[in-house]
Amino acid sequence: MGALVVLALLALTGCTATGDRQMDDRDLAVLCSNDAEVCRAWAGAFTERTGYGVTTVRLPTSEALERIRHGEDLPEFDVWHGGGSEMYVEAADEGLLAPYRSAQAAGIPEDFRDPEDRWSGVYSSMLAFCVAPQAISDLGTDIPRTWDDLLDPALDGQISTASPRTSGTAYTAMSLQIDRLGEDAGREYLAGLYGQVLQFTRSGTAPAQVVARGETAVAITFAPYCEAARAAGSHVEVVLPEDATSYEIGAVAMLADAPHPGTAREYLDFALSADGQRAGAASGIDQIPTRSDLPGNLADVLADGRYPVIGASLAERSSRRDALLAWYTEEVER
C-alpha cells in the first residue's frame, strides 16, 4: 500500500493530530512504534504545544525499520518515535538517521542515548509476564514466576507473544534467553518456549490484549501494556520473572532526508523534554522516563535493584540480531 493511501486511511481513522485543516509545509509524518494510544498522545501533545499537525503511521519496531530501509528513494517520514533502541542502532549504522544534538539531551544519561546524537532514549519498560489468574487456576497449575515455568505442559497453547521478526518486544525476550543461558542452551529453551505459543502476533503490544480477551493464560510483554489492560478492567496481573528480566530503551530519531527537518528537530526537542516524556501517560500506559530529573526514572530504577535485570550491552544485542532471527525463521517458522 502506498504511503499516500496509508496516510489517508490514518486520517480517516483518527490517527492524526491535524484536525480538519490541510497539512502545511511545517506538518510532520511520524513513524511510531508504540501502542496506538501512546502514539496519539504524543502527536496530540506536540500539536497542542506547537500548532503543527502530525500524521502518524504505526508499525512494530522491526517492520518500521524495514519501511525506513525501503523508503530511501522517496522519504515518507520525518521522525521515528518508539521501539527498542537496538533497531535504532542498526538504522544509525546504515546512515538512515540524521544526527541532532537537542538541548534537552542533557537531561538524559549518556547510557540511554547515542554518542553521535543520532537517537535518544525517551522511555523504558520492564519485560514481564501478563497472566490471567483464573485461567491459570482453571488449567490446574500455578502462576508462572520464572522463565522455566513457561515450559509447564499445562501451558501448551496458552502463551501469547509477538514474533521477534516484527517486534522489538519479542526480540528483547529472545535476546534475554541467550544472556541467561548461553547461545546453545538459550536456543534450546526458545525452541521449547515457542512450541507453547498459541499464535505469534505482529506487535509486542498485542499479547496483553490476547490474554485480556481470554484467548490465552499468559503473555510475554512489557509491563505497562499489562498494567493498562488491568486498569481498563481486565482480570490480569503483572508478574516480573524472578530469575531474570530485561528492559527496553524506547527511542526517538530524526530520519535522514526528512522532508521537514526544522519541524522534526522541534519534535525531538519536545520528545526529549520532561513534558514530552510525560505525554504518553495520558494514554493510560505509564512507561518509565529516561530523564534524570523525573521521578521513577530508568537510572534510579536500575540502581535500586528491585528487578533482576541481566543482559548484554546494547551493541551486542544489536549485533546478534540477524543470526538469531535467521535461526528463528529456519527453526520456528518453517
What are the functions of these language-model segments?
Residues 86-90, 212, 216-235, 284:
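A ligand-binding cleft/hinge motif common to bilobed small-molecule-binding domains
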Residues 184-185, 290-334:
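An extracytoplasmic/periplasmic, membrane-proximal ligand-sensing/linker region
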Residues 125, 189-194, 200-201, 232-258, ...:
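Periplasmic-binding protein-like
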Residues 130-135, 175, 248-263, 279-280:
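A bilobed periplasmic-binding-protein/Venus flytrap-type ligand-binding module shared by bacterial periplasmic
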Residues 16-90:
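Early extracytoplasmic/lumenal segment of secretory-pathway proteins
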Residues 11-14:
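C-terminal motif of bacterial Sec signal peptides marking the signal peptidase cleavage site
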Residues 255-309:
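Mature extracytoplasmic/periplasmic domains
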Residues 33-40, 75-215:
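Extracytoplasmic ligand-binding site segments that recognize negatively charged/polar headgroups
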